[in-house]
Amino acid sequence: MALLQISEPGLSAAPHQRRLAAGIDLGTTNSLVATVRSGQAETLPDHEGRHLLPSVVHYQQQGHTVGYAARDNAAQDTANTISSVKRMMGRSLADIQARYPHLPYRFKASVNGLPMIDTAAGLLNPVRVSADILKALAARASESLSGELDGVVITVPAYFDDAQRQGTKDAARLAGLHVLRLLNEPTAAAIAYGLDSGKEGVIAVYDLGGGTFDISILRLSRGVFEVLATGGDSALGGDDFDHLLADYIREQAGIADRSDNRVQRELLDAAITAKIALSDADTVRVNVAGWQGEITREQFNDLISALVKRTLLACRRALKDAGVEPQDVLEVVMVGGSTRVPLVRERVGEFFGRTPLTAIDPDKVVAIGAAIQADILVGNKPDSEMLLLDVIPLSLGLETMGGLVEKVIPRNTTIPVARAQDFTTFKDGQTAMSIHVMQGERELVQDCRSLARFALRGIPPLPAGGAHIRVTFQVDADGLLSVTAMEKSTGVEASIQVKPSYGLTDSEIASMIKDSMSFAEQDVKARMLAEQKVEAARVLESLTGALTADAALLSAAERQCIDDAAAHLSAVAQGDDVDAIEQAIKNVDKQTQEFAARRMDQSVRRALKGHSVDEV
């Protein structure tokens, strides 16, 4: 159905033209780029078959290098070799210097206090450095896919704030990339394992990289990942494992001199090689600086046990912040190369009471999840799987009195979008309002899809129609709907989040649209009838209150006429004759006009009592 062939604005709408999209894991230590080919997500290697790209840029007057070549210059030209720039993203110079006092770069502050790094290529900010890394990844993807990228999904830590996320977007734009979306790294990892379409519940993402450890506790509900808590240790990672093992080898080899950088490098290289080998073997032989010996996995485990315990303490804190227990976690996803260490997997499994997910390469899992998301957003999914991600596929609205649906955001509205409407109370003294969020094209609640319900409480007890409640619908770029209801005079509010596309197939969307057309005339008549019945109920409710308060203003004959008109309205309101109800409402209005005028006069006299003409 052509209506459902929705693409990202600015992209070709050719139904059979596959668009080129990529997922980018812009990491602190290493970065990757991935794509979906023949239905499979895979990371893209360089000419030498290396999938990881070190997140390092070396700047010179005549240009710059990125990746392995740049990393090789780190020791000789420290000031011009920028690494771990992700730590600086979105931070002020003062913040960076307080957090990382030993960085070897020459910093200068810009007029707004943001950091500038003084290099041989001039003053550069973290956005520019990140852009150079992104350009290198994009070039790898374009060459591998034989074409320019139509869009990318870039992953960011779940704890990144708005400034850090905006900095990442700015870097992508500077690199000439169209950002389809920023995706939280733990969410990307969960998507890679297909958990977004699995059982609802709590998911833990344990991310142990080279230099940092992050733990994220997510809740999957109706297709939406909610970040419940994040934690970790920014100064703990696989590099610490390497240094502990290198120091152990030094002791075994009897090397006392720590000033020889060549020996230091040799020891560290030997430690890294041994660590990797011990993931599969129980024993590994080491030959370094003229010393030969054996290291067992048990010895290595003893060295790193305290560090692994530190990660589990961070996990416990994150679970406490999230308000859940380890046994509440459905799945544990392992991310980061250091999670290959058997002791890490063993201890994590013991802590959560379940075997962690490790089938996907932990170095690649985040990039793979981003690639899957990018493939969906760019419009490459077949018709049977495609959902409308860039427009509202079905109207969103609220249930109002009489079982009617008041549409707030119409179908085919481009997202992100926000719309608001004002509503009021139906009864005198009403202090709460039930908000029922609906989806669909029909006029009555019974014919639409219920999305969510919540209540707004604390409304001041005013006469019917006296309180004003603003209901705001906001749909973000991910298709996530937030509905907020706020009483204007007090500011009390309540809200809920839901993903309208969750559980919907294209055929269901098409069927709902078709039904709205087929039953259009019938629905309009049903709405008109319901509206008249609601108005009749409102008139009778208001009249009952007025008679209770001021019946003394009427003669017996006048009261009888009003009672007869009200009884007639009450009777016809039970039927299905719209015109009869409308005429009965008009008759009640006619019979009560004099009564209303007397009530108004009485109210004015009461208001003026005790005041002189001059005061008025």
UniProtKB/Swiss-Prot annotation:
Coiled coil: none annotated. Signal peptide: none annotated. Keywords: ATP-binding, Chaperone, Nucleotide-binding. The keyword Mitochondrion does not apply. InterPro entries: ATPase_NBD (IPR043129), Heat_shock_70_CS (IPR018181), HscA_NBD (IPR042039), HSP70_C_sf (IPR029048), HSP70_peptide-bd_sf (IPR029047), Hsp_70_fam (IPR013126), ISC_FeS_clus_asmbl_HscA (IPR010236). One of its GO terms (molecular function) is ATP-dependent protein folding chaperone. SUPFAM superfamilies: Actin-like ATPase domain, Heat shock protein 70kD (HSP70), C-terminal subdomain, Heat shock protein 70kD (HSP70), peptide-binding domain. The keyword ATP-binding applies. One of its GO terms (biological process) is iron-sulfur cluster assembly. It comes from the Bacteria. Belongs to the heat shock protein 70 family. Chaperone involved in the maturation of iron-sulfur cluster-containing proteins. Has a low intrinsic ATPase activity which is markedly stimulated by HscB. Involved in the maturation of IscU. This is Chaperone protein HscA. It comes from Salmonella paratyphi A (strain AKU_12601). The gene is hscA.
